Amino acid sequence: IWSGKVLGVSGWLGAFEVEWQQENPIDLEICTRCNGCVRACPEGAIDFSYQIDLDKCKAHRECVKACGAIGAVDFARAATARKENFDLVLDLSREPLIRLHDAPQGYLAPGDDPLEQALAVHKLLGLVGEFTKPRFTQYRERICAHGRSGKTGCTQCLDVCSTGAIRADGDHVRVEPHLCTGCGGCATVCPSGAMTYAYPRMPDLGMRLKTMLATYLEAGGHDACILVHDAEAGRDQLRALGRRAGFGERGLGRKGAGRGLPARAIPFECFHIASIGMDFLLGAVAYGASQVRVLATGREAEGYVAALREQMSFANTILHGLGYEGEHFAVIEAQALEQALWQLAPARTVGKPATFNLSADKRTSLDFAFDFFFKDTTKKTQEIDLPPGAPFGALTVNKDTCTLCKACIGACPEAALLDSPEAPQLRFIERNCVQCGLCVTTCPEDAIRLVPRLLLTAQAKEPVTLNEAEPFNCVRCGKPFGTKKMVDNMTGRLGTHSMFATGGALKRLQMCGECRVIDMASSKNEPSILDYTGRK
């Protein structure tokens, strides 16, 4: 038993670390409950809780003498911070010590309600033993657009995670699998596909979706509406809706009875609704669905629902741009579920269901979907404008300010920006761009701007030249080593500096790397390290 003021709690089931400040001189872990200090205290400042009332204490220290060699009473201990590890944590504070929407498993904070406290204690009894959990996500740092060279780009997964399982780790992110609860929100918002949903896998969800819709269409169904719900609160909501159908809300007969689900509404259970991203949404319509509605029960973190609505906004914009009328994707609140489904007008469907399968690589699945819709529709739109934040788009480069320093090429994690071995060129493959903005923040000339859009032609997969310049040849050997604009800019800025005012230092900036070394070694006017020998 320890006492004191808790400073912080971290960790997860079986590995919590609690740090606290010892506020009372008596250490309950060492105390033997001999009552010697209680009898010795002349002010009666110690009761049978074996904690000293410091307002009554007059510092006689008789309790210290009474405790003797046991050493449980130490007035110098109060200033010491302590740490210990615990398997489970029951937090009875008025305000939880861990302020997360989804707290770690094994941490319970029932508040000050006695019933909730009793239920929490009962739940703790079931958290004893050995447990296994899947690793819900896979992370490929090579294509992660979080950062490069200390510059921050994409922070989507960090912003959406409600468990604190994802943290920045230099130019990449680090996922703590013990804290991850498998919502899949990080994989949904990840623009590059660096974060993928490993359990359950998207190919498995896609195959289940494809089979379900194929069976429905073969049976003569039409205008299918996929109703996505989670395996807990969402499932309970649908069961309650079914029980209420035909019997009224109070069980008093058919008058005022609920209607249940429309025949075209097909429930689709997933682990968590945050895992439903653009690949699933567009895949459902490509497989023959008219619409997808996702049931939000109110238990989800607000950030997940907001991210889901944003993904739906991107997907709706793309389908509208291709001529598919109607609202294909939306979130339905639990209290309005029945009414919203019955009032829902069907949206336009595809002519013939797609045959491709959803892949674990989100960008690949989306490429398949875009190609399919472009071939299926009669509106052959080649370019669709997208709202800011979309994971597709182009770049514009200000050719007047760009010096082709190529810093943006080194910063791009998706190989969307390329160099040319033949000439000073900045080339761009639009299909690879995820609009992370690293090129914008890295550019020293502030010459790059993002253009969110979706290009549906073959040009999106081909390199295009954004800027090119006249090469600059070394004034000593004639070898090209940069652009004329870059060298002129460099000499113009450094020409007035004292280090380049004398000798051939300024001219040396117009030489390639090898010639600079040769020129410095052969010049008699340049100071040598030997010139400084013996100086203090």
Can you name each region flagged by the protein language model?
Residues C180-C186, N432-Q435, C439, P444-I448:
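Repeat-solenoid scaffold signature
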Residues E422-R427:
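A cross-kingdom feature marking solvent-exposed beta-strand/loop segments within repeated
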Residues I1-V160, G164, D223-L238, E249, ...:
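Ferredoxin-type iron-sulfur electron-transfer modules and their immediate structural context
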Residues P104-L108, L213, L241-G246, A301, ...:
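Short secondary-structure boundary/capping segments
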Residues S192, Y197-F247, R259-R264, C270-S290, ...:
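Charged, low-complexity interaction segments
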Residues A59, K65-G68, Q156-V173, P177-G184, ...:
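Cys/His-rich finger/ribbon microdomains and the adjacent scaffold used
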Residues G170-T211, R293, A306-Q311, H328-A334:
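Terminal amphipathic helices with adjacent charged low-complexity linkers/tails
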Residues V189, T196-P203, T441, E445, ...:
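Catalytic cores of secreted or luminal carbohydrate-active enzymes
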